[in-house]
Each structure stands twice: as structure tokens, then as C-alpha cells.
Design a protein with these regions (language model features):
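Alpha-helical transmembrane segments and their immediate juxtamembrane cytosolic regions
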Residues: 2-387
Length: 387
């Protein structure tokens, strides 16, 4: 935990953060956190607008963009954190051990959140969001330290092509031919072989949406973030040319993703190569737009609202996972039976006024605001909780 260096005490200005920070990155990360909380905590999971749900299998909704946005921004953050230290190889050992420690902490937090809801070690889910972020962060840090950008570009291409070949041309050891069917593809088989069904996502049972094999292409998402971060961090380049280059990268990535989708479908659970390109392109465009508005044109008056989340992203994530459980431990009588605290709020406050879908989303918005106010206390005190 550390105090942020302050240039002003006014919370309406992003000058409270260190000047070396990319303000648009804090904003964009915070916006992603807000979106994540919104889609993860509907008032009623049975009444949700389609864009606020994950795709059933192939395809990509706005909700499917949240996770790759996080990994993409991990890549950008790696550049901003390590670019000045990378040249001195004596620093590498310390950086690697620090990255390893962070990976282990993230894995520990992810497992602890699961045990908070379901204290059953016999069915402890090993894969998870924070677990993947930790592993991808560590491996991407190693790649960034030990390679140049040209090598990383080639590695990204190798990852995307090799993953396509593995899933589409290697037979599944249990006897199935190469396929992309949820329960029968190679990635699902690997998860069952490594974790067993007792330690995977209990709602899918035979495969895990954050599985082991699909972590390989997830590294590609972070490498895209490193590529964009290197361009943003580079000094001495006209910012208009820099933004134009990034927009071109973003559009090209989206187009390549859509072309690849024709033979390797965009799929979040498999984290297909087309999904890496498509989601990475959208994130590139979004971050570039934020960079141009906030860091170039200096329209920063209201950016702090989302930076509250962005600066303390891990804290916001953990709270958004734990607080609903605490609220739902409270059972409230309703129409002859008891309902959870979150569901009660939805039924009593919003459902009598709005349609079920609107009541569900308004309930989620209130929860976003609740978590925001908790994190705002840290922001106000200039406290950043780091791992």
C-alpha cells in the first residue's frame, strides 16, 4: 500500500496521481472495472439485456470484451512500469521475483474468493480470472524483459497460428477428432486431465471458461497491449502520428479478427486467435481515443470519476466479488419465503417501477456506485493498495 504523490488535493483532477502515470490508462481501466461490476451483478440474472450477457459459445458481446481489456491493459502497464528498468540487466532478477510474487498473490486471492463462497477444498475451482491474470502477467513480464519488440511481434504471430493448428488439427486423446465443441475439444480435455471435473467451473462441468490451454493465446492479448504500450510510451514522436498509427493498428486487428472468424470463430471461452485480434483491436481503439482526449487534448475534468476504480483496480475487483456475498448472506422475508439481500433490493425498489430487465440493470448500477464510494475513500486519502 502506498500514498499517491499529490499535485493538488482536488479529487476532480487527475493530478493527484504521479505524473509518470498514463492518465488515460487509469481512466480506461476504471471504465472496464465499472463495466465488469455492472455485468456481474444484475438484480436478476434471468432478466438481463443480451449485450450484458456472455455469448453462449461463438460470437462476442460487449460483456465478452471486459476480460481481454484487462489483460490488454496489463501489457500496457508492464511497459510503463518496466521500460526504464529493462535496460539494466542487473534489475531483471529482482523484477522477475517481484512478478512471481504478484502472480502467487493473485492466484491466492482468486482461490480465496472461491473458498469464501464455497469452503469446500474437494471442489475448489483451480482456474479463475485472477489466476489467469497472474500467470499471464508473470509470463508476459518475462517476455518483455528478455526480448525486443520485433521478437515479441513474431511470438504473437506464433501464438495465434500455433493455437489455431493445435485446436483444429490435433485429435483429442479421448477419441474425438479435432473440434471446437464445448465438451469435446482439446482445451476441454486438457482441463479435465489436469484439474479433473471436481476442480473446474461447476456450471459447465466438462470444460472451464478460464482453462489452461486457452491461457496460451491470452498471453497474445497482453503482447498486443505491450505493443500498444511501447508506442504510447515512446517519446519524441508527434502525438497525432502516434494516434494515427494506433488507430490503424486497432482497425487492422479488428479486420484480421473478423477475417479469421470465418475459419476460427471468435470465442471467448476458447480465447481463439480471432478473439485475440478482434478484442485487442477494439481495446486499442478505445485506449487510443481515451489517450487523445485525456492525455493529448487534456480534457481531464471528469476523468477522475473512473480513475477512482482504475488506480485501485484490484481492490475494486475483490470488493465487487466479496460484497455481494456478504449482502446475500442476509436473508429477508418476502412473499412467504426468504430472498437474498441483493434480490430483495431488486424486488422492492426497482421491480415495482420498471420492467424486469430495466430493474435488473438499475440494481446493478446502484451496486457499481456502492463499490465506487468505498474505493473513493482510498482515492480521497491518496492510498493505492498494491500487491
Amino acid at each position: 500500500m502506498e500514498k499517491m504523490r499529490s499535485g493538488t488535493a482536488d479529487p476532480g483532477q487527475d493530478a493527484v496521481v504521479k505524473k509518470s502515470r498514463l492518465l488515460s490508462l487509469d481512466f480506461f481501466r476504471g471504465l472496464t472495472i465499472a463495466a465488469m461490476i455492472l455485468v456481474n451483478t444484475p438484480g436478476d440474472g434471468d432478466h438481463v439485456y443480451a449485450p450484458l450477457e456472455h455469448s453462449k459459445w461463438n460470437g462476442c458481446t460487449p460483456t465478452d470484451l471486459v476480460f481481454p481489456f484487462f489483460l490488454f491493459m496489463v501489457g500496457v502497464s508492464i511497459v510503463y512500469a518496466l521500460e526504464s528498468k529493462k535496460g539494466d540487466r542487473e534489475n531483471h532478477r529482482t523484477i522477475i521475483f517481484s512478478a512471481l510474487r504478484r502472480m502467487l498473490i493473485l492466484i491466492g486471492i482468486g482461490l480465496s474468493i472461491f473458498l469464501f463462497y464455497r469452503p469446500d477444498f474437494a471442489h475448489l475451482r483451480f482456474p479463475g480470472v485472477l489466476q489467469r491474470i497472474g500467470v499471464v502477467y508473470f509470463l508476459s513480464t518475462l517476455v518483455y524483459l528478455k526480448t525486443n519488440q520485433r521478437t515479441r511481434d513474431w511470438l504473437l504471430a506464433v501464438i495465434l497460428v500455433s493455437y489455431y493448428l493445435v485446436l483444429n488439427y490435433i485429435p483429442v486423446p479421448d477419441g474425438h477428432p479435432p473440434n471446437l465443441i464445448p465438451e469435446f475439444n482439446l482445451a476441454a480435455w486438457v482441463d479435465r486431465a489436469v484439474f479433473s471435473t471436481n476442480h473446474m467451473y461447476r456450471f459447465t462441468k466438462q470444460w472451464d471458461p478460464v482453462g489452461l490451454l486457452s491461457t496460451w493465446p491470452a498471453i497474445g492479448t497482453t503482447l498486443l497491449g505491450i505493443r500498444v504500450g511501447a508506442i504510447l510510451k515512446k517519446t519524441g514522436q508527434d502525438v497525432n502520428k502516434k494516434c494515427s498509427r494506433l488507430f490503424l493498428i486497432g482497425i487492422s486487428s479488428i479486420v484480421l479478427g473478423l477475417i479469421t472468424d470465418s475459419f476460427f470463430p471468435i470465442n471467448k471461452s476458447l480465447w481463439t486467435s480471432s478473439y485475440v485480434l478482434y478484442s485487442g483491436g477494439i481495446c486499442t481503439l478505445g485506449l487510443t481515443l481515451a489517450f487523445w482526449i485525456i492525455d493529448v487534448k487534456r480534457y481531464q475534468k471528469y476523468a477522475w470519476i473512473f480513475s477512482v476504480f482504475g488506480i485501485n483496480a484490484i481492490s475494486a475487483y475483490v470488493l465487487s466479488e466479496i460484497v455481494p456475498g456478504i449482502i446475500n448472506f442476509i436473508r429477508i422475508p418476502y412473499n412467504g419465503h426468504s430472498v437474498s439481500g441483493m434480490k430483495y433490493f431488486y424486488k422492492i425498489v426497482f421491480l415495482p417501477i420498471f420492467s424486469p430487465e430495466n430493474a435488473s440493470i438499475f440494481s446493478a448500477c446502484v451496486f457499481v456506485i456502492l463499490i465506487w464510494f468505498i474505493i473513493y475513500i482510498l482515492y480521497r486519502k491518496k492510498i493505492v493498495i498494491k500487491i
